[in-house]
From Swiss-Prot:
In adult thorax, expressed in the IFMs. It comes from Drosophila melanogaster. Actins are highly conserved proteins that are involved in various types of cell motility and are ubiquitously expressed in all eukaryotic cells. Required for proper formation of indirect flight muscle (IFM) myofibrils. Multiple isoforms are involved in various cellular functions such as cytoskeleton structure, cell mobility, chromosome movement and muscle contraction. Disruption phenotype: Homozygous mutants are viable and fertile, but fail to form proper IFMs and are flightless. The IFMs of these mutants display mislocalized Smn and Actn. The gene is Act88F. Belongs to the actin family. It is found in: Cytoplasm, Cytoskeleton. Abnormalities in Act88F-ifm(3)7 flight muscles result from incorporation of the mutant actin isoform into assembling myofibrils. In Drosophila there are 6 closely related actin genes. The modification Tele-methylhistidine is found at H74. The lineage of its organism: Eukaryota, Metazoa, Ecdysozoa, Arthropoda, Hexapoda. This is Actin, indirect flight muscle. The modification Methionine sulfoxide is found at M45, M48.
């Protein structure tokens, strides 16, 4: 428990990871996979106390005998029963708090359907009996965490990427662009190109191994063609990785071919623009007077922006697209993997924010629709 009686909770529900903790802290207390697993086989051993479902790390560690499901797809909650399990797990097992005693700040994807916001609100008040809650847009929180109120955020997580221009604290919905290309797609692509090398990864459990390879060894090349030539000419870029069974695999140009798909989605057979063009297009949808401020405040956020070399490459690509006289600055805070959560922690602990909460009383009077009036 926090010192103050009703310390607010901040929960950032991502497609891949759920980040949860207490407002005012500088990092989330709990970070666990947004997974619900159900046994594939009937238990053989009597009295093992097999549960009918597992959440988070426990599901991850028993992945060999479970079927894993992600209730959040492309940043948007699609399976509410499983989502409820994840929230229950967050309150009771991870944070060990009584949800009826703490206000909760939840995060949502930009362009989240209205019905979804209402459903989130309803579950918090009716299932968990929260005293108060608020829903904030993820990218806006990332910008706050970087100490700005104006800028463009490229938020790229496991399930979806968004470019969100924000002016004086308000997201500009007409200029938000969504790109269904993110960490999970890169993991799948890495699985595919490793298969071409003769290493087979197919199951949901093996995908987690590939995700680990991706996080530890991949990087973004400043010049892709040149890097490919270097990789072909020598073994200087090769790295080895030990699989859980002790087998050692070698990975070479896959290290930068995998994240290159962010800049060239055609690698994945997608016809969309790369992340650099998406940022540029998003800026061009904004009023001409604020573009300069956006170019100078381009903030990266989310786990898929953690690749070494990504900021330099973005700088290079956007400089090539933008007018030559304009100053371009890519901000890549070291804590950007959790900057949405950190922004939420900052927001929920501001004294000026305390009147913004939707209280249980307001919810009882107005119903779930209150969320559209109070959170924007």
């Amino acid at each position: 428990m926090c010192d103050d009686d009703a310390g607010a909770l901040v929960i950032d529900n991502g497609s891949g990871m759920c980040k949860a903790g207490f407002a005012g802290d500088d990092a989330p207390r709990a970070v666990f996979p947004s997974i619900v697993g159900r046994p594939r086989h009937q238990g053989v051993m009597v009295g093992m106390g097999q549960k009918d479902s597992y959440v988070g790390d426990e599901a991850q560690s028993k992945r060999g005998i479970l079927t894993l499901k992600y209730p959040i797809e492309h940043g948007i909650i699609t399976n509410w029963d499983d989502m409820e399990k994840i929230w229950h797990h967050t309150f009771y097992n991870e944070l060990r708090v009584a949800p009826e005693e703490h206000p909760v700040l939840l995060t949502e994807a930009p362009l989240n359907p209205k019905a979804n916001r209402e459903k989130m609100t309803q579950i918090m008040f009716e299932t968990f009996n929260s005293p108060a809650m608020y829903v904030a847009i993820q990218a806006v929180l990332s910008l706050y965490a970087s100490g700005r109120t104006t800028g463009i955020v490229l938020d790229s997580g496991d399930g979806v990427s968004h470019t969100v221009p924000i002016y004086e604290g308000f997201a500009l919905p007409h200029a938000i662009l969504r790109l269904d290309l993110a960490g999970r797609d890169l993991t799948d692509y890495l699985m595919k190109i490793l298969t071409e090398r003769g290493y087979s990864f197919t199951t949901t459990a093996e995908r987690e191994i590939v995700r680990d390879i991706k996080e530890k060894l991949c990087y973004v090349a400043l010049d892709f063609e040149q890097e490919m030539a270097t990789a072909a000419a020598s073994t200087s870029l090769e790295k080895s990785y030990e699989l859980p069974d002790g087998q050692v695999i070698t990975i070479g140009n896959e290290r930068f071919r995998c994240p290159e798909a962010l800049f060239q989605p055609s690698f994945l057979g997608m016809e969309s623009c790369g992340i650099h063009e998406t940022v540029y297009n998003s800026i061009m949808k904004c009023d001409v007077d604020i573009r300069k401020d956006l170019y100078a405040n381009s903030v990266l956020s989310g786990g898929t922006t953690m690749y070494p070399g990504i900021a330099d490459r973005m700088q290079k690509e956007i400089t090539a697209l933008a007018p030559s006289t304009i100053k371009i600055k890519i901000i890549a805070p070291p804590e950007r993997k959790y900057s949405v959560w950190i922004g939420g922690s900052i927001l929920a602990s501001l004294s000026t924010f305390q009147q913004m909460w939707i209280s249980k009383q307001e919810y009882d009077e107005s119903g779930p629709g209150i969320v559209h009036r109070k959170c924007f």
